[in-house]
């Protein structure tokens, strides 16, 4: 009986160790439970066969004495428990290195996948930031060019006004001040503007005024010439 208790205690200790190993490796727990179920079922069948054979042998040899049968069974039970303990030890020794060898590989694969995903995400973020920066730079360049063009256009208009005012100040006589539209029109169509002004001057009452002015000027010249001749005759 004490040997049976020792073997059962040893068996329970090994079972506790195996459960702790299972808890440490949840990824391979299902596979090992299948192996353990198969092994336990096979060993149970072996034990049942052995116990049945021993019982039959004991019954055939000593059918009258049940104590001998009990002793035989008691002597056979430690052997079976010892066999189960040895098999559990061998299975544990085979299983623990596989768990130890598989766990670092799984951890490394998880770390590699996480690193690869992180690197891909960083690359995507950097590419998006670069695209946004390029778009902003293009918009800034376009805005600067637009401002430069508007500044040049306004400066040309101002310079044109100054040049026209200088020309007007140099010209002799009084004329109507020309606007910016007139200056641009004369710059674009100078010949047409001159002909239009001439035709305007030679039509209507302007022509009459010009003709009367010319006639009066010729008469005054003739009168001056006549007076000069008369004075010359009187002196002579």
Curated annotation (Swiss-Prot):
This is Protein EVI2A. The modification Phosphoserine is found at residue 211. The chain crosses the membrane at residues 134-154. It comes from Homo sapiens. Residues 217-236 are annotated as: Disordered. It is a single-pass type I membrane protein. Residues 31-133 are extracellular. It is found in: Membrane. One of its GO terms (molecular function) is transmembrane signaling receptor activity.
